[in-house]
Curated annotation (Swiss-Prot):
Gene coding for it: rnpA
Keyword RNA-binding set for record: yes
GO biological process, one term: tRNA 5'-leader removal
One Pfam family it belongs to: Ribonuclease_P
Source species of the chain: Oleidesulfovibrio alaskensis (strain ATCC BAA-1058 / DSM 17464 / G20)
Family named by the database record: Belongs to the RnpA family.
Sequence intervals crossing the membrane: none
Record NCBIfam families: rnpA
Protein name (record): Ribonuclease P protein component
Enzyme class: hydrolase
Length: 125
């Protein structure tokens, strides 16, 4: 598990990501990304796995796989960002693997990092 400073822990942090963050979509996940102004270049992540995904066993498996993804690929994450990952309803928790998370989330993380670089260079969103 990543250190506490790397995780979103308060409801206002999640709400800010949902309301003002940009959305990125893959087949099975939605990622809300919010750039923190004037923040240290540390990224934070949060998981929002609802009961629509399945019972407690399936939700916990999904969260374990996503936490492992963030632990393994923490060097590839964009700095100064808050990220909230939400599995879509059609995701079958029995099929969630680390390979699926890498296949879908790693390109999204690169897209987020690239869009940040573009915005920093252009000055436009």
């Amino acid at each position: 598990m990543l250190a506490r400073p790397s995780r979103l822990t308060r409801r206002p942090d999640y709400v800010a990501c949902y309301n003002t963050g940009r959305r990125y979509f893959s087949k099975h996940f939605i990622v809300f990304a919010l750039e923190r102004e004037g923040a240290a270049p540390v990224w934070r992540y949060g998981l929002a796995v609802s009961r629509k995904v399945g019972d407690a066993v399936r939700r916990n498996r999904t969260k374990r796989v996503l936490r492992e993804f963030f632990r393994l690929y923490q060097d590839d994450m964009p700095g100064g960002m808050d990220l909230v990952v939400v599995p879509k309803r059609r995701l079958d928790p029995r099929r969630v693997t680390l390979d699926l998370a890498v296949q879908e989330l790693l390109p999204l993380m690169r897209e987020i990092r690239d869009s940040l670089c573009r915005e920093a260079n252009d000055g436009t969103p």
